[in-house]
Amino acid sequence: MDVENTVVEILADLTGNDDIKDDMDMDLFETGTLDSMATVQLLLELQGQLDIDVPVSEFDRNEWATPNKIIAKAKELQ
C-alpha cells in the first residue's frame, strides 16, 4: 500500500470517518476530527506501518492539520 492510501486508511480507522478522502484539505483539528489522543495514535500508526518516527515533542500541529499535509510529511520523513 502506498503512503497516501495508508494515511487515509489510518485516519479513517482512527476517526471512524470514511469520508476523509472526500476532503483531503479539511482541517482535522478545527473540525474536531482529530484530538490529542488521536494524534498520538496517528503517529504510532505511521511509525508502525510506514516506519516513520515523529517525536511528539517535534510535532507541529499546523504541519499535520489536513490529510494532504499528513501525506506530504509522511513522504518527507520516509
UniProtKB/Swiss-Prot annotation:
Keywords: Cell wall biogenesis/degradation, Cytoplasm, Phosphopantetheine, Phosphoprotein. Residues 1-78 form the Carrier domain. InterPro entries: ACP-like_sf, DltC, PP-bd_ACP. It holds the Pfam family PP-binding. Pathway: Cell wall biogenesis; lipoteichoic acid biosynthesis. The modification O-(pantetheine 4'-phosphoryl)serine is found at residue 36. Carrier protein involved in the D-alanylation of lipoteichoic acid (LTA). The loading of thioester-linked D-alanine onto DltC is catalyzed by D-alanine--D-alanyl carrier protein ligase DltA. The DltC-carried D-alanyl group is further transferred to cell membrane phosphatidylglycerol (PG) by forming an ester bond, probably catalyzed by DltD. D-alanylation of LTA plays an important role in modulating the properties of the cell wall in Gram-positive bacteria, influencing the net charge of the cell wall. This is D-alanyl carrier protein. One of its GO terms (cellular component) is cytoplasm. The gene is dltC. It is found in: Cytoplasm. One of its GO terms (biological process) is lipoteichoic acid biosynthetic process. One of its GO terms (molecular function) is D-alanyl carrier activity. It comes from the Bacteria. Belongs to the DltC family. 4'-phosphopantetheine is transferred from CoA to a specific serine of apo-DCP.
